[in-house]
Amino acid sequence: MRIGLVSYQCKNRNIAFNMKQIELAMQRSAGKADLLCFGEAFLQGFDALCWDYEADKTIARELLSDTISQLRIWTIQYGISLIVGYIEKFEEKLYSSCVVLSNGEILYNYRRISKGWKEFSITDSHYCEGNQTSAFRFHGKEMTLALCGDLWEFPDRFKADQLLIWPVYVNYTVEEWDQGALDDYAAQAALAADDVLMINPIDREPVNHGGSFYFHKGQPVAKIPFDKEGILIVEIS
């Protein structure tokens, strides 16, 4: 199985641009990947929210929205499955979520369990976290999803023998990554699983240098350069 870790630019509050980026990655990955993974909140951009619920609910998307339906259509059209981070609206609540789509179907919808995605000192009860960390099955293989701070706050809840996919939004400087942050993330990932795929989007406002990484037993074994759009293809047996 070939998994593509997509470190592409996304723009805050610009779903149309971000959708084009997703489709572009799918077009470029035809015949090269079975599954493409994008970073946390890639659909809307991690800093898309203003913490005013009446405004924020307009940019959030329901799981059965037309936007998610278009992604489902693309998984059929291009023959590539997707894992995409997005701001989810469910009833009167908002979540930082990640949806798994394959062959036109919703395989799994994960909601971040840690609160670091929001300005929790000023947000109200509309901004929520999930409480489930179950695995899902893709191409006959069990996998687990965690979003960014989940592995820092609750690593024990993700301990498993299977592959862990870890979409994040982390905007360290390149120097900070090189001077220890990357090793810290690899070590933290190892508290949960031997094999972890971490995906970080590129952003211009604020600056996020992106990067995609494959960690094995606490060591980075494959990555793509910072500040350059790319797709890291990882073979998983």
Predicted regions and their residues:
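Cys-nucleophile CN-hydrolase/nitrilase-fold catalytic domain and related Cys-dependent amidase chemistry
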Residues: 24-102, 172-194
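Conserved hydrophobic/aromatic positions in well-ordered beta-strands
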Residues: 4, 99-101, 213, 232-234
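N-terminal glycine-/serine-/threonine-rich phosphate-binding loop
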Residues: 1-35
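Active-site-proximal beta-strand elements of phosphoester/diester hydrolases
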Residues: 1-14, 135, 140-150, 165
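CN hydrolase (nitrilase-like) catalytic-core segments centered on the catalytic cysteine
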Residues: 63-81, 152-230
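Catalytic metal-binding/acid-base residues of hydrolase active sites
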Residues: 9, 42, 87-88, 150-152, ...
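Active-site catalytic loop in hydrolytic enzyme cores
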Residues: 89-159, 173-182, 236-237
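Residue-level detector of high-confidence beta-strand sites
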Residues: 97, 109-111, 166, 223-225, ...
